[in-house]
From Swiss-Prot:
Identification of the protein by name: Inositol 2-dehydrogenase
Keyword Magnesium: no
One GO molecular-function entry: nucleotide binding
Signal peptide: none
Organism, as annotated: Corynebacterium glutamicum (strain R)
Length: 337
């Protein structure tokens, strides 16, 4: 494909609008040709960054009008399957924001439908795989330079969350990212999940018991613990420490200007994911567009990866009630090798 890829974005909320701006202004080889959004005001606002884009309220209408070559799905997870199905049936390349779908049953339906095509068409938007620091850490793991990887420790901290943030979202909206990137880093899938509760923060709203400590065991024996804290106040922080046989490595440390004054040491910290992972989002979209042009269609997490994450999330939610919850998955199909 030598022409500019015509991308239809489904959903013009904050994430969709961000992707529209990214594709039209910071991505080569693609442009926004359609905005699929039932809310007219949202669609109009997003269209300001996408001159010439057609407006539709349903993905089926955009497909019927031959308005798109590929689809980026940025609606909430519960609406993914109704968009994925017609897009797959039309044979369109898809970048689907996480999660693939909200549960393993619907994710498996998508996996089974996709396998009727000649190759994987879905890339799932777990952007951490495109973060330079995560890539450097994965290269270190694969190189064996520091010996075998023994343990991983993760920090996932948000300054605060709204009243609509529920207990299950600690797993399904937040730790969901670790359930993808940790197996990718370690080269081994999650086989069990456990949740521990430290002392509850007084800043957690009614009905929310946090922070939590999520403990994962991987198939290769690596143990992982992740602190999930959504009321840390000072900023947004995602960091990982890898313990090897011959040393350790850390990523996600604060960057930017450092100051010393009046007996104080001051550093800048991110306030949300849009700055911490800005480069990762840009690289994710550019890699996907390049893959579509090359005919490989997928340059990151695929639908099977999304299915495995759904299984891990379900185990994580069950683990709120105590115990070590197994994550049982069939072998990866050759289609996704």
């Amino acid at each position: 494909m030598s022409k500019s890829l015509r991308v239809g974005v489904v959903g013009a909320g904050a994430m969709g609008a961000d992707h529209i701006d990214r594709i039209n202004n910071r991505t080569s080889g693609a442009h926004i040709s359609a905005i699929i959004e039932p809310d007219a005001a949202r669609a109009a606002a997003a269209a300001e960054n996408a001159p010439g884009a057609q407006a539709f309220t349903r993905i089926e209408d955009a497909i019927a009008a031959d308005a798109v070559d590929a689809v980026l799905i940025a609606v909430p997870g519960q609406f993914h399957e109704p968009v994925l199905v017609p897009a797959l049936e039309a044979g369109l390349p898809i970048l689907c924001e996480k999660p693939l779908t909200p549960d393993s049953e619907s994710s498996l339906r998508i996996v089974e439908l996709e396998q009727k095509l000649d190759k994987p068409h879905i890339q799932v938007g777990f952007m951490r795989r495109f973060d330079p620091e995560y890539n450097n850490l994965r290269k270190l793991v694969e190189s064996g330079e520091a010996g075998e990887l023994l343990m991983l420790r993760g920090l996932h901290r948000n300054p605060s969350v709204g009243e609509n943030y529920t207990q299950s979202m600690l797993i399904t909206d937040s730790v969901v990212h670790e359930f993808d990137v940790i197996p990718w880093l370690a080269g081994s899938r999650v086989v069990s999940v456990e949740v521990k509760y430290p002392k509850t923060s007084s800043l957690a709203h009614s009905g929310l018991k946090e922070p939590i400590l999520v403990i994962m065991e991987l198939e290769n024996g690596v143990l992982v613990d992740v602190e999930m804290n959504v009321n840390i106040q000072f900023g947004y922080q995602v960091a990982t420490e890898a313990v090897f046989e011959k040393g350790l490595a850390r990523i996600g440390q604060p960057s930017g200007m450092q100051r010393w004054r009046d007996g104080e040491f001051l550093i800048n910290e991110h306030t949300d994911f849009t700055t911490r992972f800005a480069t990762a989002y840009d690289r994710q979209i550019q890699s996907w567009v390049d893959a579509v042009h090359e005919g490989t269609l997928v340059a990151g997490p695929n639908a099977w990866d999304g299915y495995l994450v759904a299984l891990s999330c379900e185990a994580g939610v069950k683990a709120f009630d105590g115990g070590v919850i197994p994550v049982d998955a069939a072998p990866r199909p050759d289609f996704y090798a």
